[in-house]
Amino acid sequence: MAAYGVNFESANSIKSRKESKREERERVIQKAKEKFEKEERRKAERKARGEDTWMLPDVDLRLQQIGEEHTVKTKKAKKEKKAKKSKKEKKKKAKKEKKDEGDASCDSSEDSEDEWVEATLPSGGKDKSLEGEPEATPSSSSASNNQRDEWMTFDFLAMKTTSVADRRAQKEAEKEAERQKAQAIEQAGLHRLELNPYWKDGGSGLPPEESSSTAVKKAGVVNDGGVSWLRKSYQRMKEQADREQRSLDSVVAERYGSMEEFQKRLKEAEDAAYGERRDDEKERGRREEGKESWRRNDREEGRERWRRDEEKDRWRRNDRDEGRERWRREDGDEEKERWRKDGWRRGENEDRRRERSPNAERERARSRDDLSSKFLKPSEDEEVSRGAGFKKGSSSNQSAAFRKPVDDVEMSREAGFKKGSSSNQNAAFRKPVDDEMSRGTAFKKGSSSNQSAAFRKPVDGDHDDDEMSRGAEFRKSSSSNQSAAFRKPIDNNNDGRGVAAAWRKSSAVQDSETPTLQKHTEKSAALQEDSKTTTTVSSSESEEEEEEELILTDEEMNKLGAKIVKAEIMGNTALLEKLRAQMEAARRAKEKRAQIKDQSKRASKPAVSEKEVLLFRTDPSGRAWPVNAPSETLEPRGGRRKRKAIETHQDGERVRYFDDDDGVDLREMVRREKMSSAEDQNALYSRMAAKMMGRTDGDNYTLDDMFVSSAAQKERAGRDEERQRNKAVQETRRLAGRMEKCPHCFDSAELPKHLIIAVGTKVYLCLPNSVSLTEGHCLIVPVQHHTAATGLDEDIWGEIQMFRRALVRMFESQELDCVFLETHMNPKRHLHMVYECVPMPRELGDMAPIYFKKAIMESDEEWAMNKKVVDLSKRDIRQAVPRGLPYFSVDFGLQGGFAHVIENEQKFPHYFGKEILGGMLDLEPRRWRKPIRENFDDQRKKVLKFAQWWKPFDCTKSDS
C-alpha cells in the first residue's frame, strides 16, 4: 500500500516540466536581450545624429550663464562666510588681547605695589610722611573710580552651608524622635496584666503576617501551576519558528527574554506543581502493586474458562480451524516471538500459506464480498487511538496485535487474538461468525486503545483488499468507548446466547509487564514509521539517504510535527528522537535551499547601495510632514492572538468608541482631520468590515453593531505607526520612481534637451516631443518637479505668467490668438505639471470660450459635488480651486478662463482640452489621442523656426 503523505511523479513528467521551464526561461532571456539590443541601437542612432548633445546656441549660452552665476554665487557665499569667520576670529583675538592687557596691567600694578611696599625704609619721619601720601592717593582714586559691587566684597567662606544628605539625616532623626515619643506614650498606657501577647511586649497588637504570606503562597499554585500553559506556549513558539523560518531561541527571546529564563520559569512551575504530588504517586504505586497478583490470576482463570467454552462449539470441528489450532499448539509462544522479530522479513508467510485448508479461498472471497462496503483508507484516527493507548498503558491490550501472519482470511477476521503478558503469551481466538458487523464490533477498545493494531507485516499489492478490511475493523474498534473485553463469539442461530463474560478494565499498568511492553511499542512504532515514509520495501540505508535529500513541503512538515507531539504524549523516546532527526534534516535542507536561492539572486542582481531617506506623508493639499518614529515596541506578529476588548461604557453611558480615545486631544484630532484623506477613512472602514463580516451573532445584529464592536477592540501595539510608515515607504518609492523617469524634470536623463527654447530661473519653455497640434504649440514647464499650479510658490507662478505674456505678444505679432491649458489628474501618480500653449486663428479664438464652456458643462458626472464651471476672469487657479483636487483649467490669452473640478477621473479624458481644440481646428484624432512621434530632423527644424519667432520677445534676456 502506498505510503501516507508521499506523492509519486514519473520521471517523464519531471523531465517534461524541466524542459518546458528551460524553454520558457530561454524565451524570456531572448526577449530581454532583443529589448536591450533595441534600446542600445536607438541610443547609438541618437548619438550619431547628435540628438543627445545638440541644443540651441542661445540655450547653451544661457545654461553657461546660469552655471557661472551659480559658481559666482557659491564663491561669493564662501567668501562672505570666510570674511565673517575671519571677522569673528579678529573680534575674539581683540577681546583676548584686551583681556590679556587688563590682566597684565593688574599684575603689573600689584607687582609695582608690592615692590613699592618692600622698598619703604622705616628710617625718618619724612620718609614716613612721604610714604603715607602715595598710599592715600591711589586708594582714594581707586575707591572713587572702581567701586566694587556688594556681592564682590561678600565673604562667602563665612556663610553657613548644608548638604542634602545632612538635611535628610536631620529629617530622619526628627521622625525617629517622634516615633519613639509615640511608642513611649503607648507603653505608658499599658497595664502590667495585659493579656494580648502581641501587644504586651512592645508589639503592635496584631499577629505577624506569616499566615497571610503562606496563604498567598499556597493559593499561587492552581491546578498544575501553569505548567501546561508554559508547555503549550513552547509548542506555539516552535510552530512560529517553523512558520517564519527562524531559530527557536530568537522566538523564545522575544517573549521571555532568553531560553534560560523560559526554562527557569518552567522548572519553577513544575517544582511548585509536582513537588507535592510525587509522594502521593509513590503511595499510589504501592497500592497498585497489591492488585497485580489478583489481576494476573483472575485473567488466567478467565482465559481457561473461555477456552473450555470454545471447545464445546462446532466451529473447532471444521477443517479450516483445525489447521489454526495446530499452529497454536505446536508453535507456541516461542515461534510467535521469533516471527515478530524477523519472520516477516524472510518471507515465512509463503511457507504457512501452504497449510491453509481447502475452504480458505472460498472463505476469503466471501469475507471480501461482505466487507466491500467497509473498505476504507486507514486514517489518523488509528494513530490518535494508539496514542491514547500508550498514554494509559494497558499491557494486555497493547500487545494484542503482535500476531502470527496467517492467511489473509484469518488476518481480516482475527479480531479476538491477543498476546498476553511476558509470563503468559497464549493466544486467544474468536469464533468466525457470518455477520461481519458483529465480528467488527466484537473487538472492543478498552481504557487503553489497541496501539499496535496496525503494526503488521507489509504485504504485496494483491493483498490490499485484506489490508483495507483490517484497517476498517480496527478503526471501528478504536472508536468504541467501552472497556476492553474478551467476549465469546456469537452465532446468528444462537439468539439466546449473548456476549460471554466480559472482562474488567485494563487501565492499570503492571510493573512486571512494562519493560516488555515498552520494547514492543518502540519497535512496532519504528516499523510503522518506516512503512509510512518509504515508497517500497527497501533497506534502511536507502531510506536514510532519501530522507537526507528529501525537502518536505509545509503540509508534510506540519504532519511530521504532529507525529512528534504524539510521540511526546506516548513517551516513546526512540520514535521521538528519530522524528526530531527527520525534522532537523528537513529544516536544514530547506535552509540550504533558501541560501542557494539567495546566493543566486545576489549573483544575478547588482549590488544596491543603501541610503538613508527621510520618510514623509503628503496630505491632500500637498503639504508634507515627516513620519514619527515608533513610540512603543511593536508586538510580534503571527499566531492566534485574540484582540482585547476595551471598556466603552461606564454606568450605562458611553465613554469611548476607539481604544485610543483617551490619548487623543483636540490638537491631535485637528491634525488627523487635516492630514488624513478620504482614502484613509475608506481603509479604516474596510478593515473594520473585513474582520466582522459574516459574524452577526451575539450583539452584532446590524451592520452598525458590527462596526461598533470592531472599533471597541484594542489594536496591536504600534500597528498604526507601522501602517503609516509602510504608506510613507510606498509613497517615497513611488515618487522616486516617477521622478527618475520623468521626461520634464530639468536634471532628468529623459529630458529631450534639443527641444528647449528658453530657460528661466524657475521655469523653462520647450516644444512637445510629438507632432504639434498646430504650428507654434509649446509648453511652459517648471524646472523642479511640481504636480499642479495650485501648489506652486509665488515666484514660480510669477515666472509662468511672464512667459505667458511674452507668448501672447509673440502670437499677436503674427495675428494669432492662443489658448493655455492645464490638466491635473490622479495626484497619486505625481505627474509633472505642464502648461500648454496652443495658437489658433483669431476668429476661432473669439469662439473658444463658448466651445469650452459648453463642453465643460456636458462633461464628467451629471450630479457633481462641486461647481461645474469656475470663472477665472477675476482670480487665478490657485485661488479658485483647493489644493489636492484634480482639475482642468483653460485661459484665453491674457484674459481669464474657466476651471472644472474633476469628479470622476474614469469618465474625464486626459486629452479633454486638446480634443476640443482638435474639433475646432478640424484635426485628426490621432493628434491628441496617441501623439505621433517625430524624427530628430523634423524636431530640429521646428525648434529653429520657433526660436526665430521667440528671439525678439525673449523675456529671459531682458530679465537677465
Curated annotation (Swiss-Prot):
Basic residues composition bias: residue spans:
73-96
Which SUPFAM superfamilies does the UniProt record give?
A: HIT-like
| Keyword hit for Amino-acid biosynthesis | no
What's a GO cellular component annotated to this UniProt protein? post-mRNA release spliceosomal complex
* Amino acid composition bias (Acidic residues), ranges on this chain: 108-117, 541-552
Q: Which Gene3D superfamilies match?
A: HIT-like
Which keywords does this Swiss-Prot/TrEMBL entry list?
Answer: Coiled coil
Q: Where is the composition biased (Polar residues)?
A: 507-518
> Keyword RNA-binding, does the record have it?
no
- Domain of life (superkingdom): Eukaryota
Q: What is this protein called?
A: CWF19-like protein 2
According to the entry, what is the taxonomic lineage of the organism?
Eukaryota, Metazoa, Chordata, Craniata, Vertebrata
Q: Which gene encodes it?
A: cwf19l2
